[in-house]
Swiss-Prot record:
Residues annotated as signal peptide: none
Keyword terms, alphabetized: Ribonucleoprotein, Ribosomal protein, RNA-binding, rRNA-binding
Gene Ontology annotations for the cellular component aspect, listed alphabetically: ribonucleoprotein complex; ribosome
Organism: Polynucleobacter necessarius subsp. necessarius (strain STIR1)
Function: One of the primary rRNA binding proteins, it binds directly to 16S rRNA central domain where it helps coordinate assembly of the platform of the 30S subunit.
GO aspect biological process, one term: translation
Residue ranges of the TM segments: none
Subunit structure comment from the entry: Part of the 30S ribosomal subunit. Contacts proteins S5 and S12.
Name of the featured protein: Small ribosomal subunit protein uS8
GO molecular function: rRNA binding; structural constituent of ribosome
Family the entry assigns: Belongs to the universal ribosomal protein uS8 family.
Entries under PANTHER family matching the protein: 40S RIBOSOMAL PROTEIN S15A
One Pfam family named in its UniProt record: Ribosomal_S8
Domain of life of the native organism: Bacteria
């Protein structure tokens, strides 16, 4: 079965796994998914991630993070979709929950948070919001 939006599938798998308190979630790996997982780890939303499996079909394993029995990620929402791409210039990058959350943005310099994109002075495609 073909997945029309692999990033939305990744975010949904994370959301569903945290809803039932799973410690680990697995999914097919890609460069963009690994970059998103790296941003989530750097910002403290997930414990760890690793790529396992053979080179032809790598699998991304994400260790989810909980605090006092509650998921650290309260909300994770897809913004830009394959049918409706959302691009923001360097001056129009949104703040999530007045700076309490992050927006993950795909820029020419790679995938990064909204704060890093503002500091670097680049815009790009808004992939998702995380709070």
């Amino acid at each position: 079965m073909s997945i029309s939006d692999p990033i939305a599938d990744m975010l949904t798998r994370i959301r569903n796994a945290q809803a039932v308190q799973k410690p680990l979630v697995t999914m097919p790996s890609s460069k963009v998914k690994v970059a998103i997982a790296k941003v989530l780890q750097d910002e403290g939303y997930i414990e760890n991630f690793e790529i396992k499996g053979e080179a032809a079909k790598p699998v991304l394993h994400i260790d989810l993070k909980y605090y006092a029995g509650h998921p650290v990620i309260e909300r994770i929402d897809r913004v830009s979709t394959p049918s409706l791409r959302i691009y923001k210039g360097r001056h129009d990058i949104p703040e999530v929950m007045n700076g309490l959350g992050i927006a993950i943005i795909s820029t020419p310099q790679g995938v990064m948070t909204d704060r890093k994109a503002r500091a670097t002075g680049v815009g790009g495609e808004v992939i998702c919001y995380v709070a």
